[in-house]
Swiss-Prot record:
One of its GO terms (molecular function) is DNA binding. GO terms for biological process: negative regulation of DNA-templated transcription; response to redox state. It comes from the Bacteria. Modulates transcription in response to changes in cellular NADH/NAD(+) redox state. NAD(+) binds at residues 91-96. This is Redox-sensing transcriptional repressor Rex. Keywords: Cytoplasm, DNA-binding, NAD, Repressor, Transcription, Transcription regulation. Disulfide bonds: none annotated. The gene is rex. PANTHER family: REDOX-SENSING TRANSCRIPTIONAL REPRESSOR REX (PTHR35786), REDOX-SENSING TRANSCRIPTIONAL REPRESSOR REX 1 (PTHR35786:SF1). Belongs to the transcriptional regulatory Rex family. It is found in: Cytoplasm.
Length: 214
């Protein structure tokens, strides 16, 4: 199957949502799904679904719909969800602790293998209820050496985000999901995905205000 390498970011961000929808269809024993059914489940229009799918070659036939099992497996392959992906979490503050206790593996094949914080943090040397150990950040390089871990969730204060990012890159991390509302400088080959909760809330409030004006 030919896959277009220039997939727009908006499409890429919907991939996990498509995967979730097809898993739900499969659980409901739906065998075929039309672009309209997929669009309705996603809250988007069917033209967007067809355009997104066009980047991945021929996924279905016009008038026949999409094979649910085939597409579920396709997105599982695309998102590497056949084997467990281990990640680390850095920053055990309020957001970090909440994520440490979130059961990612109940929904997808990913899990937090270790947590890290400043060496003097009270949580260092302890384990969560799910047996996730928390270590001092100074040991991150040796802790993930000889493991398959290349991904980190970053939930540290903004003023420390770049410094910690540099440590993670030196340790071999290639992908960072950052909750710090600052731009992180990273070398080519390292990918940063930012989650700015304040910005997302402000965007929500903006659209709510536009609704009131209408």
């Amino acid at each position: 199957m030919v896959i277009d390498k220039s997939i727009p970011k908006a499409t890429a961000k919907r991939l996990s949502l498509y995967y979730r929808i097809f898993k739900r269809f499969h659980a409901d024993q739906v065998e075929k799904a039309s672009s309209k059914q997929i669009a309705d489940a996603m809250g988007i229009d069917s033209a967007t679904v067809r355009r997104d799918f066009s980047y991945f070659g021929e996924l279905g036939r016009r008038g026949f719909g999409y094979d649910v099992t085939k597409l579920m497996n396709f997105f599982a392959d695309l998102l590497n969800d056949h084997s467990t992906t281990n990640v680390i979490l850095v920053g055990c503050g309020n957001i970090g602790r909440a994520l440490l206790h979130y059961r990612f593996h109940d929904r997808n094949k990913m899990q937090i293998a270790m947590g890290f914080d400043t060496d003097d943090n009270a949580l260092v040397g302890t384990k969560t209820a799910d047996n996730i150990p928390v270590h001092g950040i100074s040991s991150v390089k040796e802790r993930i050496a000889n493991t398959d871990i290349e991904t980190a969730i970053l939930t540290v204060p903004s003023i420390h985000a770049q410094e910690v990012t540099d440590q993670l890159i030196e340790a071999g991390i290639k992908g960072i999901l950052s909750f710090a509302p600052v731009h992180l400088q990273v070398p080519k080959g390292v990918i940063v995905q930012s989650v700015d909760l304040t910005s997302e809330l402000q965007t929500l409030l903006y659209f709510m205000n536009q609704n009131h004006l209408d």
